[in-house]
């Protein structure tokens, strides 16, 4: 995408973008929630669709002139339905957090009880964290992983549910390297009369490719982001495998009298006008492009390689005496407990950044350090796989990471980081991103 006009008009922003292009091109991205969007997705993001207000939904807008943005939103919805095998989808949420808020506000009242995975055990802010709306407006209870295995103990989840009787149970994570047993969660939800929501923001691409458990047959609601493993623009989405009459008794007046609203109608109204106004039509157009890409056979090949690369990295880390929380990975990421290496997550993140490798510090289960320091790092393979890297690259990268972490606290740390940075730049230089290349 050419930005010569920006270079002339706003050199400061142009320089920032230029430097970010170099960073993405010459360094290795291992943050699990990041990826490279295709040039086609980027073009849609930067299209004239950004100029159009379109409050409402296709065919029912509050503004005129929406006939072409309606085409884009209809395509996004139909492609998402095909990709995930769902009956209902709302592609308007601006983010995964907005999608989660839309569901929670649709079925809960302030003070209602919810359950979600503890943030420090791999959950997400919107699953009940005390610093987030989900933990401030609702009575949030967190389940966790077993101290020894690092796995979610479903018996403990059931015990908690029977004790606190939640209105909503959330299954999903931002730093859990195993799959979720959605069927078992649904059985627990049914026992206590709770709604079940799956937040698949991280593994959505792997689920769409059929590589992980499908939440659609078991969960009342499924939310996701559209970037991460889906390689789309930054945004959110709400889905339901099957629509159903809302059990809260919300009705609507029709010519034939009052009827019970379908759950899809409740959610649509909660997104707009409930928590949002005008949708981001350029982003929705880009979502449609990304879903179209994900429906191609090449996307499943990509998803298979993402998981293979993660498995190879985890095994290599384990062979070098690193502690992978839960003992390995079945998805695209791993959470590494660095306490046996006597290095904090913050130190590891900073050293690896100097070495041209981007990761994020992350709390580990039962961490005794603050979120600003942490005892671990989170690593993911979506972006490196988009570069065309395979298992051999994954193993070589782990060896480089080990060199950097092993040099922590030594006088040679700067030299080691410089050497590794040169090797990373050379490795990235042999693997151009092509259709996913971040260019000016």
UniProtKB/Swiss-Prot annotation:
One of its GO terms (cellular component) is cytosol. The modification N6-(pyridoxal phosphate)lysine is found at residue 228. Its EC number is 2.1.2.1. It is an enzyme of class 2 (transferase). Pathway: One-carbon metabolism; tetrahydrofolate interconversion; Amino-acid biosynthesis; glycine biosynthesis; glycine from L-serine: step 1/1. Its cofactor is pyridoxal 5'-phosphate. The record marks 227 as: Plays an important role in substrate specificity. One of its GO terms (biological process) is glycine biosynthetic process from serine. InterPro entries: PyrdxlP-dep_Trfase (IPR015424), PyrdxlP-dep_Trfase_major (IPR015421), PyrdxlP-dep_Trfase_small (IPR015422), Ser_HO-MeTrfase (IPR001085), Ser_HO-MeTrfase-like (IPR049943), Ser_HO-MeTrfase_PLP_BS (IPR019798), SHMT-like_dom (IPR039429). Catalyzes the reversible interconversion of serine and glycine with tetrahydrofolate (THF) serving as the one-carbon carrier. This reaction serves as the major source of one-carbon groups required for the biosynthesis of purines, thymidylate, methionine, and other important biomolecules. Also exhibits THF-independent aldolase activity toward beta-hydroxyamino acids, producing glycine and aldehydes, via a retro-aldol mechanism. Homodimer. Belongs to the SHMT family. This is Serine hydroxymethyltransferase. The gene is glyA.
């Amino acid at each position: 995408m050419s930005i010569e006009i920006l270079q002339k008009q706003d050199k400061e922003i142009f320089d920032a973008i230029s430097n970010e292009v170099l960073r993405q091109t010459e360094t290795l991205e291992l943050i699990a929630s990041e990826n490279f969007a295709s040039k086609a997705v980027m073009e849609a993001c930067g299209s004239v669709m950004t100029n159009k207000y379109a409050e409402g939904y296709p065919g029912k807008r509050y503004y005129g002139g929406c006939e072409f943005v309606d085409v884009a939103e209809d395509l996004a919805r139909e492609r998402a339905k095909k990709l995930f095998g769902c009956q209902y989808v709302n592609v308007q949420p601006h983010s995964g957090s907005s999608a989660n808020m839309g569901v929670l506000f649709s079925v809960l009242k302030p003070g209602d009880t919810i359950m979600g995975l503890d943030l420090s055990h791999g959950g997400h802010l919107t699953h009940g964290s005390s610093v987030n709306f989900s933990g401030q407006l609702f009575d949030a209870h967190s389940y966790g992983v077993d101290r020894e295995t690092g796995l979610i103990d479903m018996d403990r989840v059931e015990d908690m549910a029977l004790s606190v009787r939640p209105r909503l149970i959330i299954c999903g994570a931002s730093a859990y390297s195993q799959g979720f047993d959605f069927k078992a969660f649904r059985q627990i939800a049914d026992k206590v009369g709770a709604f079940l929501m799956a937040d698949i923001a991280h593994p959505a691409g792997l689920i769409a490719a059929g590589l992980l458990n499908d939440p659609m047959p078991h969960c009342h609601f499924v939310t996701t982001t559209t970037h991460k493993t889906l390689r789309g623009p930054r945004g959110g989405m709400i889905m339901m495998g099957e629509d159903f009459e809302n059990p809260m008794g919300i009705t609507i007046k029709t010519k034939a009298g009052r009827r019970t609203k379908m759950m899809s109608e409740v959610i649509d109204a909660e997104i707009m006008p409930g928590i949002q106004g005008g949708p981001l039509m350029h982003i929705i157009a880009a979502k449609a492009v990304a879903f179209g890409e994900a429906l191609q056979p090449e996307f499943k090949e990509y998803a298979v390689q993402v998981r293979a690369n993660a498995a190879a990295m985890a095994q290599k880390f384990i062979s070098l005496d690193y502690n992978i929380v839960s003992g390995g990975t079945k998805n695209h990421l791993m959470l590494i407990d660095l306490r046996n290496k006597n290095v904090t997550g913050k130190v590891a993140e900073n050293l690896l950044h100097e070495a041209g490798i981007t990761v994020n510090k992350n709390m580990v289960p039962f961490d005794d350090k603050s979120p600003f320091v942490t005892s671990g790092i989170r690593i993911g393979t979506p972006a490196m796989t988009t570069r065309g890297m395979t298992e051999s690259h994954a193993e070589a990268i782990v060896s480089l990471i080990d060199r950097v972490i092993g040099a922590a606290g030594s006088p040679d740390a700067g030299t080691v980081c410089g050497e590794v940075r040169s090797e990373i730049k050379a490795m990235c230089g042999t693997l151009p991103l092509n259709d996913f290349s971040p260019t000016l």
